Amino acid sequence: MAKVNLEQIEHAVRLILEAIGDDPNREGVLDTPKRVAKMYAEVFSGMHEDPKEHLHKVFGEDHEELVLVKDIPFYSMCEHHLVPFYGVAHVAYIPQGGKVTGLSKLARTVDTIARRPQLQERITSTVANSIMEVLEPHGVMVVVEAEHMCMTMRGVKKPGAKTVTTAVRGVLENDAAARNEILSFIKTK
């Protein structure tokens, strides 16, 4: 996959400024194309990374009970409007066969997946699927809560409205008690 083409983004931003009736040579926006290009390279950096790579570092721990990392902040861009959505991800898994990954690896996986034009539903399922594929745990549950600027600043204009998505894999799919336990841990501050 090609890397971000900064020059092409700069050109496109100049065209947008012209298309909305602004002067791209005006002092206040003269460097805007460069700034936007650099920002896009950063916020879309996940396009050029494999999120599963973070999960390959495992520790041979004989732990086969719940691991939960909650309130992992993330920022992403809605693929429909290219405006931000942001929130927190809660990632729970039940290790199997001594495959326990570092806690930071779960956060890095969320970040890599979020840093692309995205849908919240896809972030949620891709995190769960990546963990299932690499760590082969007994089960995974991912809960993502986010506010979408496409709902806040345009369209229905509902600031503060949160969207919650879930993905459940493995033994947790058929274990309501375990899912409820995870949800109760997530609610605990």
Swiss-Prot record:
It is an enzyme of class 3 (hydrolase). Its EC number is 3.5.4.16. It comes from the Bacteria. Disulfide bonds: none annotated. One of its GO terms (molecular function) is zinc ion binding. Keywords: GTP-binding, Hydrolase, Metal-binding, Nucleotide-binding, One-carbon metabolism, Zinc. It holds the Pfam family GTP_cyclohydroI. SUPFAM superfamilies: Tetrahydrobiopterin biosynthesis enzymes-like. The keyword Transcription regulation does not apply. Pathway: Cofactor biosynthesis; 7,8-dihydroneopterin triphosphate biosynthesis; 7,8-dihydroneopterin triphosphate from GTP: step 1/1. InterPro entries: GTP-CH-I_C/QueF, GTP-CH-I_N, GTP_CycHdrlase_I, GTP_CycHdrlase_I_CS, GTP_CycHdrlase_I_dom. Zn(2+) binds at residues 78, 81, 150. It catalyses: GTP + H2O = 7,8-dihydroneopterin 3'-triphosphate + formate + H(+). GO terms for biological process: one-carbon metabolic process; tetrahydrobiopterin biosynthetic process; tetrahydrofolate biosynthetic process. Toroid-shaped homodecamer, composed of two pentamers of five dimers. PANTHER family: GTP CYCLOHYDROLASE 1, GTP CYCLOHYDROLASE I. HAMAP family: FolE. This is GTP cyclohydrolase 1. It comes from Bacillus thuringiensis (strain Al Hakam). The gene is folE.
